[in-house]
Amino acid sequence: MALWMHLLPLLALLALWGPEPAPAFVNQHLCGPHLVEALYLVCGERGFFYAPKTRREAEDLQVGQVELGGGSITGSLPPLEGPMQKRGVVDQCCTSICSLYQLQNYCN
C-alpha cells in the first residue's frame, strides 16, 4: 500500500506533462477522397448531397462566361455582372479552407 502512495505523485506529474490533445477537427483543405471521407464522418447515416457536374456541363459554363465577358478564356476576366454561381463543396473545401460547420451544410 505504501508503494501506491509513492507512485501517485509520479503518475500525477506524468499526466500533467503529457502531450496536449489535438483538436477534433482543424480547418483544412479537403480534396478528393479526403473530402468524401470527411463528409461520411460528419454526416454519418444522414448521407450527404453530391451532384458532380459532367464534363459537358463544365465546358458549357466556361463558354457562357466567355460569351458574357466578350473575351477569351486566356484573355481578360469576365465582368461581375450575370448570375451568381453557387459554390459547391469542392470550391468551399478543396480550393479554400473548410470548417466542420461548412461540411455539415452538405449533409442531407
UniProtKB/Swiss-Prot annotation:
Classification via SMART domains: IlGF
Q: What GO biological process terms does the UniProt entry carry, in alphabetical order?
A: cellular response to oxygen-containing compound; glucose homeostasis; glucose metabolic process; positive regulation of protein secretion
Localization, UniProt:
Secreted
User: Chief localization class?
Assistant: secreted
Disulfide-bond pairs as recorded: 31-94, 43-107, 93-98
One Gene Ontology MF term: hormone activity
Alphabetical GO CC annotations of the entry are: extracellular space
Its signal peptide is 1-24
- Excised during maturation, the propeptide residues are 57-85
Q: Which InterPro entries match?
A: Insulin (IPR004825), Insulin-like (IPR016179), Insulin-like_sf (IPR036438), Insulin_CS (IPR022353), Insulin_family (IPR022352)
- Which Gene3D superfamilies does the protein's record reference? Insulin-like (1.10.100.10)
UniProt entry keywords in alphabetical sequence: Carbohydrate metabolism, Cleavage on pair of basic residues, Disulfide bond, Glucose metabolism, Hormone, Secreted, Signal
Say which family it is in: Belongs to the insulin family.
Functionally, this protein is described as follows: Insulin decreases blood glucose concentration. It increases cell permeability to monosaccharides, amino acids and fatty acids. It accelerates glycolysis, the pentose phosphate cycle, and glycogen synthesis in liver.
Assembly and binders: Heterodimer of a B chain and an A chain linked by two disulfide bonds.
Protein name per UniProt: Insulin
Give the gene name: INS
